[in-house]
Curated annotation (Swiss-Prot):
Family: Belongs to the class-I pyridoxal-phosphate-dependent aminotransferase family.
Class of the enzyme per the UniProt entry, highest EC level: transferase
Protein name, UniProt field: Aspartate aminotransferase
Assembly description: Homodimer.
Superkingdom of this protein's organism: Archaea
CDD domains named in the record: AAT_like
The organism of origin for this protein: Pyrococcus abyssi (strain GE5 / Orsay)
Reactions mediated catalytically: L-aspartate + 2-oxoglutarate = oxaloacetate + L-glutamate
Keywords for the protein's UniProt record, in alphabetical order: Aminotransferase, Cytoplasm, Pyridoxal phosphate, Transferase
Gene name in the database record: aspC
Length: 389
């Protein structure tokens, strides 16, 4: 199938559609887009200015600046217990989102299947389709905190299955995989000879004394894992567009070819700033301050949603919460439209994240505390007036 045909199979993100509608309305509180409301820490901006003054305005290596790859290797070893060679097992990208299409294109053949636990981030399935593969949804359930269960994976694996995508902490559910979960997933991947793409962009935003574990740190897993991460969420740098992957050298080699004829290279002065940021304690202090504030907001939204009659699992990570709206009698799309038009609150229908997301909506609490309070008041008022809970 030609790429043009594959593009016809991919639909625009439901999240973006909602965002575009909300942007044309007045007095809307958007709890839709998953973006930190914090500004990039000032010292990171200063590093970027420093790089510009140094003349770092030219092309860099396709694989990324050596200084940044070395800083990433240090971070992976210290924080994730992953040993990766910065010269051939780490690559810098123009945003972490690039990793899915580029990574899948490194090994996936036409018609091969990729298991995607759902509800899932909206970019996964389109990336599989554009790479020539077939996305296979594997449902996760509220009763298990939306954590992936290997017993479910066993129901969907076939001879055509080539890879598995995992996301912990998870967008949209906020679930966090336990070490035991990852060990079972790793055994499953080895048994079926699968490549694992592990999306860990929310790793620093975890709560209730939960710990983050990287599947690539487990014995025998680095050689079959593409670890995806970035700077957008960690340091509130979404507009800077910078991500990275750690993977076996044969995968990195192919991804570099993709980047060579696509973006060429990530922005040079931004890479300089990111390398400095990773080694600056002020950056990690800022991350912890953001985490604490997200936690405060999480507790507020979780409490209010349950009080207004929308049963909600308490998320352990990221900055999303996934309330159940089935008892209202509305579909997730109908519920989202009602909240946008009547309450002027933008939330994302769970159906945007796969079949398992129907009956839920995603709320981002990466929004000022006072706005969240107002949004909860508005939502509760509409639910009471319409007698939906």
């Amino acid at each position: 199938m030609a790429m043009s045909d594959r593009l016809d199979l991919v639909n625009p993100s439901e999240i973006r559609k909602l965002f575009d509608i909300a942007a044309g309305m007045k007095d809307v509180i958007s709890l839709g887009i998953g973006e930190p409301d914090f500004d990039t820490p000032q010292h990171i901006k200063e590093y970027a200015k420093e790089a510009l003054d140094m003349g770092l305005t030219h092309y860099g290596p396709n694989i990324g600046l050596p200084e940044l790859r070395e800083a990433i290797a240090e971070k992976l070893k210290k924080q994730n217990n992953i040993e990766a060679d910065p010269n051939k097992e780490i690559m810098v990208l123009v945003g972490a989102n690039q990793a899915f299409l580029m990574g899948l294109s490194a090994f996936l053949k036409d018609g091969e299947e990729v298991l995607i636990p759902t509800p899932a981030f909206v970019s996964y399935a389109p990336a599989v389709i554009l790479a020539g593969g077939k996305p296979v949804e594997v449902p996760t359930y509220e009763e298990n905190e939306f954590r992936l269960n290997v017993d479910e994976l066993k129901k969907y694996v076939t001879e055509k299955t080539k890879a598995l995508i995992i996301n912990s902490p998870c967008n949209p559910t906020g679930s966090v995989l336990k070490k035991k979960d990852l060990e079972e997933i790793a055994d499953f991947a080895v048994e079926h000879d699968l490549i694992v793409i592990s999306d860990e962009v929310y790793e620093h935003f975890i709560y209730d004394d939960v710990k983050h574990y990287s599947i690539a740190s487990l014995d025998g897993m680095f050689e079959r894992t593409i670890t995806v991460n970035g700077f957008s969420k960690t340091f509130a740098m979404t507009g800077w567009r910078l991500g990275f992957v750690a993977a076996p050298s044969w995968i990195i080699e192919k991804m570099v070819k993709f980047q060579m004829y696509n973006a060429t290279c990530p922005v040079t002065f931004i890479q300089y700033a990111a390398a400095k940021a990773l080694r600056d304690e002020r950056s990690w202090k800022a991350v912890e301050e953001m985490r604490k504030e997200y936690d405060r907001r999480r507790k507020l939204v979780w409490k209010r949603l349950n009080e207004m009659g929308l049963p909600t699992v308490k998320p352990k990570g990221a900055f999303y919460i996934f309330p159940r709206i089935k008892d209202t009698g509305l579909t997730s799309k109908e519920f989202s439209e009602l909240m946008l038009m009547e309450a002027k609150v933008a939330v994302v229908p769970g159906s945007a994240f796969g079949k398992a997301g129907e009956g839920y909506v995603r709320i981002s609490y990466a929004t000022a505390y006072e706005k969240l309070e107002e949004a909860m008041d508005r939502m509760e008022k509409v639910l009471r007036e319409k007698k939906l809970t």
